[in-house]
Amino acid sequence: MADFFAMPLWTDFLWPLIVMVAQSVLLLVVLLIAIAYILLADRKIWAAVQIRRGPNVVGPWGLFQSFADLLKFVLKEPIIPSGANKGVFLLAPLVSCVLALAAWAVIPVNLNWVIADINVGILYIFAISSLSIYGIIMGGWASNSKYPFLAALRSAAQMVSYEVSIGFVIITVLLCAGSLNLSAIVEAQHTSGLATLIGLPWLTFLNWYWLPLLPMFVVFYVSALAETNRPPFDLVEAESELVAGFMVEYGSTPYLLFMLGEYVAITTMCAMGAILFMGGWLPPVDLPPFNWVPGVIWFSLKLFFMFFLIAMAKAIVPRYRYDQLMRLGWKVFLPLSLAMVVIVAAVLQFAGIAPK
C-alpha cells in the first residue's frame, strides 16, 4: 500500500485530482449558501427602500426564506410546452447555471485561496460570461413562443454591446497591474499606487484602482448591470413588456436553475469589481486592527458592498428603453472607455510608472 502512495500515478495525478474535487465541492457549497442569503438581501434592500419589512416569516427575520423557496421549486412538477424542443429546453437552464458556477474556479477570495490560479484568469472569466448567453438563447428558442424568443434576441444584443466596454475596462486594469492573473492584480494594488507615491503605503485604499480609474469603475458597474440583465437594464425579463422574458415557459427546477445562474453571475461581477478596483482581500488600512481581520472577510464585505450598489439600482432607477440602452453602450461607454485606455497608457508611459 505504501508503494502505491509513492507511485507517480498517485502523487502527480490522483492526489491533486482529489484535492481539486474537494476544493470545488467546498466552494460550491459555500457559494450556494452565500447566494441564498444574497437573494434574501436583495429582497430586504428592495423592501427597505419601499418602507416594507420584506420576507420575515420563515425563520428568525426571514433568514430561511430562500431555503423555503428552494423546497417549493423542487417539489413542483416541471411542465414542458407541447411545441418545445424538449432536449434543448431542459439543457438551457443547466448550461446557464453550470457556466456561471465555473467562473468561480479562478476567483481568489484570499491569498492563495483559489482553485486554479491561472495567468489568464481575467480572460477566463470574460470568456465564461460571454458563453452564458447561449443558455438564454437556447431557452428562448426551445420554448417555441414569441415572448421568450424576443427576450433571447434582446439578451444577445445587450450582452455583446456591454462586453465591449468591460473588455476595455480589463485593458486599463491590465495596463496598471501588468498581469492578467487575478491574484497578481490584487497584489499590485498592495505594492504600488497613489499611497505609495505620496509615502503613506499603509493607506492601502488609496492604492486601489477605484481612485485613478474612477471613470472605468463607473463604466464597469453600469456594464455589469447590463451584462447580468439587472435593472435598469432588465429588458430581457421586463415583466411589463415580455411577461418573464426568456423564462416565461419555465417552472419548477429549470426556472430555479436559471435564477441561480443569474444570481451567481451577479455575484461573479461583484467579486470582479472587488478584485479589480477595491483591492480584493486587502484591508483598507494596513495597520492594526484592520490587518488582523482575515482577508476573506474583507473580500466578502467588498463583494456585498458591490451587490448593495447593484440592488439599490434596482430599487431607485427606472428601466431604460431599448434604444437608450444601445445608445449608452455604443455611443457613450465605447468612446469613453477607448479614450481612457489611451489616457492611462500615456500617463503610465510618460510618468515612468508603467509596470515592468
UniProtKB/Swiss-Prot annotation:
What HAMAP family does UniProt report for this protein, alphabetically?
A: NDH1_NuoH
**Magnesium keyword on record:** no
Q: What class of enzyme is it?
A: translocase
Q: How does it sit in the membrane?
A: Multi-pass membrane protein
What chemistry does it catalyse, as a reaction equation? a quinone + NADH + 5 H(+)(in) = a quinol + NAD(+) + 4 H(+)(out)
Subunit composition? NDH-1 is composed of 14 different subunits. Subunits NuoA, H, J, K, L, M, N constitute the membrane sector of the complex.
- This protein is called NADH-quinone oxidoreductase subunit H
| Taxonomic superkingdom | Bacteria
Q: Which family does it belong to?
A: Belongs to the complex I subunit 1 family.
What Gene Ontology molecular-function terms does this entry list? NADH dehydrogenase activity; oxidoreductase activity, acting on NAD(P)H, quinone or similar compound as acceptor; quinone binding
Q: Does the keyword Transmembrane helix apply?
A: yes
